[in-house]
Amino acid sequence: MFDLDQFIADLRAALAERSRQALKEVVARGVSDPASLLRRVGEPDQPAVRVLHQGPDLTVLNVVWAPKQVTLPHDHRMSAVIGMYGGREDNTFWRRVSNPTKFQIEPAGGRALGLGDVTLLGRDVIHSVLNPLTKISAAIHVYDGEFLTAQRSMWDAETLVEKPYDISAVTTGMPLHDAR
C-alpha cells in the first residue's frame, strides 16, 4: 500500500544519506504498485501537475501528461528522479553548444520510460518530454530542492535560444494543483 507520508520520510532519509541510488530505489518502490499509488493520488483523468510535497530540500510532483503532449527543452538546476506508473514518457536530452552559430543547444540522446521505469537526472541535465501515446501517461517526479520557485531556463522550440523558465509555457494545458 502506497503511504505518502512514509514515501516522503523515505525520500528524506535517502537525501540525508546523499545517495542518488537510494533516492532512485525509494521512487522505484513507490511506483512498483501502480494500483496502490492510484488509490492515493487518484486516477489520472486530465493532464496536470499535482504537488504532493513541497519544501526547501524536496519537491514531489504527480505529473500527468496529455496524449501526444510535448514540453519545451528545459533544465531543473537540481537533481531529479522520475518514476513511471502509467503510460510512457520519452525524454530527449540536450547539450549546450560550445560555439553556437544558430542554436544554443543540440540533441544529445534520449531515453524512453515505460511502466515501472525509474531514471535519475543530474542537476545540469536539459531535457524535453514527449508522451507518444494516444492516452494519458503518469509519473512521480522527485526533486532535491524547491522546484516550483527555482530559477531555471527553457529553450524556445523554434530558435533553441535560452530564456527564463515559464512553467505555463513548458507545461501548456497542464494546470498546477496542490494535492497535499
List the predicted regions and their residue ranges.
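N-terminal leader/capping segments at the start of a protein or of a new domain
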Residues: M1-S36
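A short glycine-rich, His/Asp/Glu-containing loop-to-beta-strand
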Residues: L38-Q69
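A short beta-loop-beta micro-motif enriched in histidine and acidic residues
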Residues: Q54-L58, Q69-V81, E106
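Short beta-strand His + acidic residue motifs that chelate non-heme Fe in jelly-roll/DSBH
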Residues: T71-H74, N91-T92, L121, H127-L133
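Glycine- and acidic-residue-biased ligand/ion/polar-headgroup-sensing regions
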Residues: M78-V97
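A short hydrophobic beta-strand segment most commonly corresponding to one strand
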Residues: V81-G83, T134-T149
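Short acidic-glycine-tyrosine-enriched beta hairpin
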Residues: R96-I126
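Conserved double-stranded beta-helix
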Residues: G145-R180
